[in-house]
């Protein structure tokens, strides 16, 4: 997972039959969701370039999300209290009703690592993501809180919940789906080289879904993720998609 590179991710989601686009931008993630306790280290910048696309699909099921460019940095010089802030650029994110481009999203996350509160304590993180710049279009303003713990021979497990703008977090049928739970897991297959990760978010909305994939750490400060992502509401996000995610710390 992105826990070693603790990155920013945002994913464009769309409802093709309505000609509408929406998006969400997140802080450090596991795979598809923010189900992770990690926070970007102080003074370390992170660049993420993420793509999602269908595989061997014919129209109208074929499609791809616009490429996401995300930048994040840790801003607190403390070991036990950490904070990251990030921005994502999603071009072109056009509101079909007005023709306006609303590509920028902000996010932040506070956290404290495992063992910082007392011996054996879980890591804890909380923050907001998909802080959009256009009211009633991109301001999902989703709050999330997570707790995570390393378990020998199993890996790390992260559990938490999210809640956002009830006017935007809805199903494809218009039902309010503003809250849900998230769970994530990651484990090294080969230390500092290959890692497997999986996650899931509940809710028939733009957030709901998950998947599992493989991280290849091809350099000390860089990784590539590949794997499938599945969605709870195909009416919002379309068919399942393959993701490739490049992450670089500097």
Describe the function of each predicted region.
Residues 24-143, 148-153, 163-167, 186, ...:
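Transmembrane beta-barrel domains of Gram-negative outer membranes and organellar outer membranes
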Residues 161-181:
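Glycine-rich phosphate-binding "P-loop"
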Residues 205-206:
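Generic helix N-cap/helix-start motif at coil->alpha-helix transitions
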Residues 1-29:
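Cleavable N-terminal export/targeting peptides
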Residues 156-160:
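Alpha-helical interaction elements
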């Amino acid at each position: 997972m992105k826990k070693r590179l603790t990155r920013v991710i945002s994913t464009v989601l769309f409802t093709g039959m309505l000609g509408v686009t929406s998006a969400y931008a997140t802080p450090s993630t596991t795979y598809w969701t923010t189900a992770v306790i990690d926070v970007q280290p102080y003074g370390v910048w992170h660049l993420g370039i993420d793509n999602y696309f269908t595989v061997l699909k014919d129209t109208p099921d074929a499609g791809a999300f616009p490429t996401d460019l995300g930048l994040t940095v840790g801003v607190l010089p403390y070991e036990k209290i950490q904070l990251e802030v990030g921005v994502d650029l999603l071009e072109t994110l056009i509101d079909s009703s007005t023709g306006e481009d609303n590509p920028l999203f902000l996010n932040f996350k506070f956290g404290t690592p495992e063992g910082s509160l007392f011996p054996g304590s879980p890591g804890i993180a909380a923050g907001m993501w998909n802080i959009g710049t256009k009211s009633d279009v991109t301001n999902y303003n989703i709050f999330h809180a997570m707790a995570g713990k390393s378990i020998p021979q199993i890996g790390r497990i992260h559990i938490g919940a999210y809640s956002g703008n009830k006017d935007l977090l809805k199903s494809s049928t218009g039902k309010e789906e503003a809250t849900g739970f998230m769970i994530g897991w990651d484990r090294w297959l080969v230390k500092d080289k290959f890692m497997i990760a999986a996650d899931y978010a509940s809710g028939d909305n733009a957030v709901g879904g998950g998947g599992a994939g493989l991280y290849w750490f091809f350099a000390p400060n860089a990784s590539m993720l590949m794997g499938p992502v599945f969605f709870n509401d195909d009416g919002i996000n379309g068919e399942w998609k393959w993701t490739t995610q490049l992450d670089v710390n500097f």
